[in-house]
UniProtKB/Swiss-Prot annotation:
The modification O-(5'-phospho-RNA)-serine is found at residue 937. The active site is at residues 1003, 1039, 1128. ATP binds at residues 515-522. GO terms for molecular function: ATP binding; cysteine-type endopeptidase activity; RNA binding; RNA helicase activity; RNA-directed RNA polymerase activity. It comes from Broad bean wilt virus 2. It holds the Pfam family RdRP_1. Keywords: ATP-binding, Covalent protein-RNA linkage, Helicase, Host cytoplasm, Host endoplasmic reticulum, Host membrane, Hydrolase, Membrane, Nucleotide-binding, Nucleotidyltransferase, Phosphoprotein, Protease, RNA-directed RNA polymerase, Thiol protease, Transferase, Transmembrane, Transmembrane helix, Viral RNA replication. This is RNA1 polyprotein. Gene3D superfamilies: 1.20.960.20, 3.30.70.270, Trypsin-like serine proteases.
């Protein structure tokens, strides 16, 4: 028989035992008197069997208990007595056998009947106990040895003992209710204890020996019940017995269950036998029989429902604490092995109330009750407090409905309890009293106090609303209580509202919304404000809408939120922008108020929301420093509409997109939010972070001292304000009766007046004969005025500390009376003396505060109101309570026990989790302590006492009495993974996943409703985000789910290696560590716990149940451990292959075993391959050294694979006389740790490898994908235009090795360089790099090594589908560095050697692309392959000057290290698009390029994993770096002009740029130079994590425009030659170190030195021929061992540079200017002049922006610039611009108005020129238009020849390409 059936039939037995009809039949039976007791027991069993037969025939419970059924069965019993008993057919022996058979069948289905000897039963009814004892003896209990004789007997005995125990408990309950027990609860508990002792008599010696607390069990249960009553603030005064009985019944059930477990653990019982179920059913059956069936038959069905409710309450507690239901189902499953077992999700004790509500919803067909929301909304845990409140409402509403049917009238008690408990009124009132105490203790003007008052008021309003919405309204006294408390709160709120902080405050958080009209900015502002108020639990009346036109802050009452609509649209007296500078500040800001009564208001709102169409400040705002305004906007959000998405009134934000912008110019994009939920998550998280920072700042400030003078000034100021509040009659009375006095304060009955000498006078209201209106006004303002005086005293704490430190005690204890003298309640003599010494004005306000805020009792004002309400209701309650039937009292008691006994149930739960008799006994002694029950259930943490987790001591779980192994590796996993997810008041454990996400238990995460605010608390920090159910990834057959979202912080990359995904590789059985980190409600903090478990891989499916949630789990990990509620999400850590890994997460418990699901794998977590067949041997560290997200040191390489790096430089220092007195600011770099040059300095331990790898710590970003694609697409279009004649296909292996002869940029593979890894391991003595792997003649070399060929094929094949891994060798670069980078701040650079096979594959794939890229540098931005000695340098200079002479020279920090994968992926797409490849080849190209950004780096023996950057040994490094450089600048440009598409899409029209690797020069036209400048680049790049400095002066802050001749490129400058070409001299600082250090590896030092001298000569020749000649002479003069023939002479240098410049042409053959040399000077080819210049004598050209002369000195022709001239001083030339004509007018205009003979313009010019005036042609941005006008007018009047105009206009065309139309349209000038 299963337990549920047993529960029913035992109930039948107890019902039978209580029937009066059976007693009557026994009395009438014709049997001996001594046999009547036995007959009564027999007939009860017989009647119970008849009830069971009715049940089997299909009758329901109500039919079985109906009057008709009872009468029918009574007739059957009567017939049985007549026919069988009285006739002798059933003698004493037969009746005992019948009874025994029934007990055997019911109490144990495994019990086999044993033959018993016949024995005489007692004949006296007083010997019933003896019958029981004999019965127990017959069932196998031996008093001599306290042992169980047989297993079957043990179960039988235990079951029967519990049967009797339950009977006695039930009898005691009935006795209490019936009044037979006069001493009440004590006697009731005494009888329960006696019954327990008698029934468990056989085991009492063991129980008493193990549990000394057993003797005190009565006091323990009383203490528990008393604690529960206090928890609900003693609302049940006079009705406590229902709580004591209900709590006693629930507690007794738990104790029985715990004792059963103890007996199983100690082997007294072989297995659990369902003691709790048996006890509950028999107890309820007894009550039912004794009360329902005898006293209330007509309502038996309803009362049976109530008793069933009581039983279920007890079972709910058992299930929540001990997973009792799971144990029962498991035992049932053992009988039916075909069914899958069930595990229970351990989500928390909060589900108990939900289970109660679910039960009550089945009481009637109308199971959905409207209580503000349907009960169906409660079926899943949702918004914490609201959900619990709704469930309490629902449960009490149902109980009230049933009580109405039972009582016949509506229960006022239950209706009031619905409100008092459902709305938690007592806790609200207690919080109000705490608030008053806090206000007295601290400055009541604080924003925190003000907000807390607002929260309490909002909560009170919600309570009042809840009272009105209930179906059972409750008493008027309860409604009056809520109203009275709410009015007092509002009075308190008003008393502090006219104030604020006049000291340093928290700066409010400002959110600025911008966007086009009609995008819905205002609706977003309103929604953000409402959501913020909801999260902060404030009412909607806390929003203040600021009117920008109002010079006053009319209506401002320190609202929490201030909104500005159309911010600054119409400037007022003070603009919104100017106002914000003071509002968003930490300085106090006094608002300008209209009325005198409102003076003294200070702004201290917490959130400011503004919306406006424009980003920048209004030009008329009066803000001179725009940055001061812009930086006050903490978040700038641009609102835009999603194309094609219509407006939805139900969700106004559904069609909006939000873009986070930088608050400062140029307002670059930072992040885009596609949904409002994502935006709200970001804003609320940012707000919380802002609040934390502001609090830290305020805590750092010192307490300011003050003096008496300031205090008196403040007092006078307050009296002025108080005077303005007081009625005129009061002021008049004070002037007449108390001249020289000021009105101080009033308590509503007396008024106090203060004099400057400190005296205080008083007068009663009756004396002043005030009207009722004046008295009301005094009462209304009294508290407010007193609070202001109190705050004044708090502001001057050093003057009178007593008024500050003891203000609370003085007020609360009423130590000051109305006469302002100490009262009798202040018994301390010293304190009375101190109070008497207080100034009278302080005593006055302290008295008034006590009058308003306290009562005569020691309780607070609000709790005293509750006490008064309880007193008024007590008589009504007691009258009603007497009418209640027993089941209803038990129902209420057990329900409140569930709600109020949380700490007790947690204590019992912790006791259940203990294993072993020793730990169980020790834990029970603590839990059942009479003095305290809370916080005592922890096991002493011995084995791990030295362990800590997040600064908390790790608590051990010793389930099997063994210590837990928890090494540093496992601790690192827990520290990295463990996180707490909090939604509303629910906390659950989750595990951070690689990337941006976390693993969690599905039955927990799936219950979170979409759209709620969720908090993630981990080692990374706290993040708030809005829950999106669509982001929850679920896995078939696995209870662990994965949640991925971009709003979470990114975890460390190394986490992936510590998670074990492969279930098949796990052993069938293995040891593991169970680690949890969850909230302990008893100690009110997070507690880390761990324990050892033995895991088994369980391949049998089971069903996981959690509330209504059901899911079948086919495979899991199981372990014997008594886990508890809240353990779901705990980590299962196991040692796999020598190191700890995460193998699973705990998800369920079935009453005996815990269950965990395996970690699910998802493709988004990782993708991993290796390098060919080679496996690098290394020892991985348990805790990798994290340099940053992009780089971590993983471990040590085994010696057999390690490569030793040489620490010796190849540079040799030359003798001092060879230095020739030239300076040297460079030294050879530091190549290894322990460099002797650093000995004794702070850098003595400098490691160049660790320092060099740090550049890879973090990648740049984030980048906007759409913008990045646009920029890259534009670059590829230029490539495609330039690549028409270039093949782009892949070359064969021979070409990749040998190159192509006579084809530029198709060089052969360099064989002398390193071969890379792992080939470097095979290098023998004398071997040279790659050369040993090839054979053949030069030009026809072939690879002969099969291993290299195999690796080449492997790279080509694998890269088609995946990114191959690389093993790279890091070497310190042996170079000369500035002294500061060697001695002062060592900074050596690393060179990366890649595998030879990989490099060859790269050459095969990209050689044609490289040739194109270098060959077409004439049109491309990148100048890779440029010859600085050739005319290319001039071409490059001209290209830059084509946009003007505003040039930016930038220098990047960590350029090699920050290349992100997203850009490398785009570069791969760009190359693939140019090569026109198919999809497979495109993937192969990208994977090959991404391989170098995700590689293993070998630094000596340390192995690093690098996830970004580009290695220097990559064949395409300089090309990729050049592309990256170009992308970054164009990406910045794109975002700079995103508000101007026409400029944004025309980069080349406004900017000319050249790049070479990380070097760049950016020439910006005048038209955009004010916006796209160095400051913008620095700021924008900083937002991407990139540091950019000035390329010339790296110590300079910011980047300024330079002229070309002041820039450098590739360490070379620009110098103009006389012939108009540009030279590229290298900086001299880079030349002289060649004289100090030489590389003498191949040559002797002298030969190397001479080579260096010749290099210097070549470079000096570019500076100046004379300098080169002087240097040559100095070398020959000082170093006579050098012959003159060894150094290049001037002629040889000239020939060299001529050949470099012109190929075969003579460099000295220069063009001779044919005419008018001065005319040519201003316009150098490629240069856009802006400086005022004289082109021929007396004729000047100038640009408007750069002209600094005096117009009075010239006859001015002003071209399109508005200016007035006198007739003889010039004129303005206005004309319509021609499209694409370089700033010149149309041809028709020029011919008719400029060059036509005799035209007005020409005539005026001729006259001025012939008069000898200085003539000035001035145009706007450059001199080009004025230059062309001047040349044409000079030629038209014959001042210059046609040849001169030809030359001049040709050079103008070279400067401005748009003038190319001139020869065609103006042939006469050419």
């Amino acid at each position: 028989m299963d337990f549920s059936t047993m529960q029913v039939v035992v109930g039948f037995l107890k019902t039978s035992m209580g029937l009066q009809s059976i007693r009557d039949i026994v009395q009438k039976a014709k049997v001996d008197e001594k046999d009547k007791t036995l007959l009564h027991i027999h007939l009860c069993f017989f009647h119970a069997n008849e009830m069971a037969r009715d049940l089997n025939e299909g009758m329901d419970v109500s039919q079985i208990h109906s009057s008709a059924a009872i009468k029918y069965r009574a007739a059957i019993v009567t017939r049985h007595v007549k026919m069988n008993v009285e006739t002798g057919g059933y003698d004493r022996k037969r009746m005992v056998e019948y009874n025994n058979e029934t007990c055997v069948n019911w109490f144990s289905c495994e019990f086999k009947e044993e033959k018993e000897e016949s024995q005489e039963l007692p004949v006296d009814e007083d010997c019933v106990e003896e019958i029981v004892e004999n019965f127990l003896e017959n069932c196998g209990i031996s008093d001599q040895n306290d042992q169980i004789s047989t297993t079957s007997n043990a179960n039988y005995a235990f079951g029967q003992g519990l049967y009797e125990y339950a009977t006695r408990v039930s009898d005691a309950i009935v006795a209490v209710i019936s009044g037979s027990i006069k001493k009440g609860i004590d006697e009731f508990l005494d009888k329960v204890y006696a019954a327990m002792s008698q029934i468990f008599a056989a085991w009492m010696p063991k129980i008493r020996a193990a549990f000394q607390w057993f003797e005190n069990i009565k006091e323990v249960v009383k203490n528990w019940a008393r604690t529960m009553h206090e928890k609900i603030n003693c609302i049940l005064v006079g009705m406590e017995d229902c709580l004591y009985m209900g709590a006693g019944l629930v507690a007794a059930t738990c104790i029985v269950t715990l004792l059963e477990k103890f007996m199983v653990v100690t082997k007294i019982l072989p297995a659990p036998c369902g003691a709790a179920t048996l006890f509950l059913t028999t107890a309820m059956a007894t009550i039912s029989a004794a009360y329902v069936c005898t006293k209330a038959v007509e309502k038996s069905v309803m009362l049976t429902n109530v008793l069933h409710f009581v039983t279920t309450n007890c079972q709910i507690v058992l299930n929540a604490l001990f997973n009792h239901d799971a144990t029962k189902k498991e035992l049932g499953a053992n009988q039916n092995e075909g069914e899958a077992p069930t595990g229970v999700g351990q989500f928390g004790i909060s589900t108990m109330l939900q289970d109660v509500a679910n039960l009550m919803s089945t009481w009637s067909t109308n199971s959905v009750t409207e209580i503000g929301r349907t009960f169906g909304a409660i079926s899943q845990i949702k918004n914490g407090i609201l959900a619990l409140r709704d469930m309490v409402y629902f449960v009490f509403e149902k109980l009230s409905d049933l009580a109405h049917k039972v009582l016949g009238f509506e229960s006022q008690v239950l209706a009031d309890l619905t409100i008092l408990l459902g709305e938690n009124v007592a806790d609200w009132l207690s919080e109000c009293d705490c608030m008053v105490s806090y206000m007295l203790e601290f400055n009541s003007r604080n924003r925190e106090i003000f907000d807390r008052l607002s929260q309490l008021i909002e909560k009170g309003r919600l309570i009042r609303t809840g009272v009105l919405r209930t179906g059972h309204r409750g008493s008027s006294q309860v409604m009056a209580l809520v109203t009275k408390a709410l009015e007092k709160l509002i009075e308190l709120h008003n008393s502090v509202v006219m104030s604020g902080s006049n000291t340093t405050r928290k700066a409010p958080f400002m959110v600025f919304f911008t966007g086009a009209s009609g995008t819905g900015k205002t609706s977003v502002v309103q929604r953000v404000a409402i959501n913020w108020l909801q999260e902060e639990q404030l009412g909607t009346n806390e929003i203040y809408s600021r009117n920008g036109q109002d010079p006053f802050w009319s209506g401002y009452k320190r609202h929490a939120v201030v909104t500005y609509d159309d911010f600054g649209a119409v400037p007022g007296t003070t603009s919104n922008e100017a106002e914000i500078i003071n509002v968003i500040s930490r300085n106090p800001y006094a608002t300008v108020m209209a009325g005198l009564a409102e003076k003294g208001m200070y702004f201290d709102s917490r959130l400011v929301l503004a919306s406006r169409n424009f980003l920048a400040a209004n030009p008329e705002s009066g803000v001179h420093d725009s940055e001061a305004y812009e930086r006050r906007r903490h978040a700038v959000i641009r609102v835009s509409l999603k194309p094609g998405v219509p407006y939805n009134a139900d969700d106004p934000c559904a069609n909006q997109t939000y873009t986070l912008l930088d608050s400062k110019t140029p307002f670059r994009e930072i992040q885009t939010f596609e949904t409002y939920a994502e935006l709200w998550s970001y804003l609320y998280t940012s707000f919380k972070e802002h609040e934390v920072q502001e609090e830290l700042y305020l805590k750092s400030l010192p307490i300011l001292d003050s003096d008496k003078k300031e205090a008196l000034e403040g007092l006078v100021g307050l009296t002025v304000i108080a005077t303005s509040f007081a009625p005129k009659a009061v002021m008049q009375y004070g002037m007449e009766k108390f001249p020289g006095h000021h009105f101080l304060v009033s308590d509503g009955e007396k008024c106090y007046f203060w004099h400057g000498d400190g005296s205080v006078e008083s007068a009663s209201v009756e004396q002043m004969q005030l009207s009722k209106q004046d008295v009301a006004q005094l009462k209304q303002q009294g508290l407010s005025t007193a609070m202001m005086y109190k705050d004044l005293a708090k502001a001057f704490p050093t003057l009178n500390s007593l008024a500050v430190l003891y203000a609370k005690n003085i007020v609360v204890k009423r130590w000051v009376g109305p006469d302002l003298e100490p009262t009798k309640t202040c018994e301390d003599v010293y304190m009375r003396e101190q109070i008497g010494n207080l100034p009278k004005w302080q005593r006055a306000y302290l008295y008034v505060l006590s009058k308003y805020l306290t009562t005569q009792s020691p309780r607070g004002w609000f709790m005293e109101c509750l006490e008064e309400t309880k007193k008024n209701l007590r008589a009504t309650y007691l009258w009603e309570y007497k009418q209640w039937p027993l089941p209803l009292k038990l129902a209420l008691g057990s329900l409140i026990a569930i709600m109020a006994g949380g700490a007790i149930w947690y204590s019992l739960q912790s006791l259940w989790c203990m294993s072993g008799d020793a730990s169980f006994v020790a834990g029970a002694a603590t839990v059942f302590s009479v003095s305290s029950f809370a916080g005592q259930s922890d096991i002493p943490n011995r084995d791990n006492s030295e362990r800590s987790f997040r600064n908390r001591k790790v608590r051990a779980r010793t389930w099997q009495g063994q210590s837990s192994c928890f090494g540093d590796s496992a601790l690192w996993i827990a520290e990295t993974c463990m996180a707490t997810l909090t939604f509303s008041n629910v906390r659950t454990q989750v595990c951070l996943a690689p990337g941006r996400g976390f693993f969690g238990v599905n039955h927990c995460l799936a219950a979170i409703p979409a759209g709620v605010m969720v908090k993630m608390d981990s080692s990374i920090g706290v993040t708030y985000f809005v829950w999106g159910k669509e982001k929850l990834l679920q896995f078939d057959g696995n209870e662990i789910a994965l949640y991925m979202t971009s709003t979470l912080p990114k975890t460390v990359d190394s986490l992936l290696g510590r998670i074990h995904f492969d279930v098949e590789t796990l052993p069938k059985t293995f040891s593991a560590v169970f680690f949890s980190y969850k909230y302990d409600p008893m100690i009110q903090q997070m507690v880390p716990e761990l324990g050892s478990v033995t895991c088994k891989v369980h391949n049998k499916a089971y069903t996981l149940a959690h509330g209504e949630y059901r899911r079948e789990i086919p495979q899991s990990l199981s372990y014997e451990a008594s886990t508890v509620a809240g353990d779901c999400g705990s980590l299962i850590l196991a040692e796999i292959e020598g190191k700890f890994k995460l193998v699973g997460m705990h998800v369920a418990f079935n009453g005996r075993e815990g269950s965990a699901s395996f970690m699910p794998y998802h493709a988004s977590l990782d993708q991993k391959v290796g390098q060919g067949d080679f496996m690098l041997k290394y020892q991985e560290w348990a805790e990798p050294k994290i340099l940053g997200p992009g780089c971590r040191a993983m471990g040590l390489i085994d010696p057999e694979h390690a490569l030793a790096a040489s620490g010796k430089t190849t540079f040799v220092e030359t003798p001092e006389e060879w230095h020739l007195d030239y300076p040297c600011d460079k030294l050879p770099s530091v190549l290894a740790r322990g460099d002797p040059r650093l000995a004794g300095t702070v850098h003595a331990d400098y490691d160049p490898f660790a320092s060099g790898m740090s550049k890879y710590a973090k990648e740049a970003g984030p980048f906007d994908a759409a913008s990045l694609k646009q920029v890259c697409s534009g670059i590829v279009e230029i490539w495609e235009d330039a690549s028409a004649d270039f093949p782009m296909d892949e070359v064969d292996l021979d070409t990749a090795i040998n190159g192509l002869e006579n084809v530029e940029f198709f060089d052969a593979l360099v064989l002398g360089t390193s071969e890379g890894f792992p080939y470097r391991l095979d290098r023998g003595p004398g071997d040279k790099g790659k050369s040993r792997y090839v054979s053949g003649e030069s030009g026809s070399l072939k690879i002969t090594d099969e291993g290299v060929l195999s690796d080449i094929a492997w790279f080509e094949e694998v890269s088609k589908t995946q990114v191959p891994d690389l093993y790279c060798i890091e070497c310190v670069k042996d170079e000369r560095l500035p002294i500061r980078k060697v001695l002062h701040e060592p900074k050596s650079r690393l060179f990366t050697v890649l595998p030879m096979s990989y490099n060859i594959v790269i050459r095969k794939k990209f050689l044609n692309f490289v040739r194109f890229f270098m060959k077409r540098r004439d049109v491309l931005t990148a100048q890779v392959g440029i010859n600085p000695y050739s005319r290319e340098w001039t071409r490059m200079a001209n290209k830059l000057l084509s946009k003007g002479n505003n040039i930016l020279c930038c220098d990047y920090s960590r350029f090699d290290g920050f290349l992100p994968k997203c850009i490398m992926n785009e570069i791969g797409n760009m190359i693939a698009r140019l090569m026109k490849t198919d999809e497979v080849s495109r993937t192969q190209i990208k994977n090959l390029m991404l391989a170098c950004t995700s590689r293993y780096a070998m630094c000596n023996r340390v192995l690093y994993r690098v996830e970004n950057g580009i290695p220097s040994g990559f064949p395409l490094t300089v090309i990729v770096n050049s592309i990256l450089n170009e992308i970054l600048v164009k990406y910045a440009y794109w975002h700079c002009f995103e508000d101007n598409p026409s400029v944004q899409s025309n980069f080349d029209a406004h900017v000319s740029m050249v790049v070479y690797g990380d070097d760049n020069l950016i020439s910006v036209s005048d038209a955009i130079s004010s916006r796209f400048d160095g400051n913008f680049l620095v700021s924008f790049m900083e937002g991407l994590g990139i540091k950019v400095t000035d390329g010339i002066d790296k110590t300079k802050v910011g980047i300024e425009f330079r002229r070309l001749e002041n820039c450098d490129f590739l360490k070379r400058s620009f110098k103009m030659s006389p012939d108009g070409t540009w030279r590229s001299p290298m900086s001299k600082e880079s030349l002289w170190p060649q004289l100090h250090f030489v590389k003498a590896k191949k040559l002797e030092m002298a030969e190397a030195y001479i080579n260096n001298c010749n290099n210097i000569l070549r470079e000096l020749w570019l500076h100046d021929v004379k300098e080169a000649e002087e240097f040559r002479n100095k070398v020959l003069r000082n170093l006579r061992w050098i012959g003159h023939e060894q150094l290049l002479n001037m002629q040889q240098l000239a020939v060299f540079h001529s050949e470099q410049m012109n190929g075969v042409s003579d460099f000295l053959s220069t063009c001779v200017t044919v005419d008018s040399i001065p005319l040519m000077d201003p316009l150098v080819p490629g240069m856009l002049p802006v400086k005022t210049s004289e082109i021929i004598p007396r004729v000047f050209v100038a640009a408007e922006k750069h002209f600094e002369g005096n117009f009075n000195d010239f006859f001015t022709i002003s071209i399109t610039t508005s200016r007035k001239f006198e007739e003889d001083k010039g004129f303005v030339l206005l004309f319509p611009y021609g499209a694409g004509r370089g700033g010149l007018p149309t041809t028709q205009f020029m011919r008719e108005n400029v060059i036509r003979k005799g035209c007005s313009i020409q005539k005026k010019f001729r006259q001025a020129y012939e008069k000898g005036n200085n003539i000035l042609f001035i145009s706007q941005s450059s001199v080009v238009p004025s230059y062309v006008f001047a040349v044409m007018l000079l030629h038209s009047i014959g001042a210059i020849s046609r040849l001169s105009s030809n030359k001049a206009l040709t050079q103008a065309m070279q400067t401005c390409k748009r003038l190319e139309y001139l020869p065609k349209e103006y042939e006469e000038f050419f």
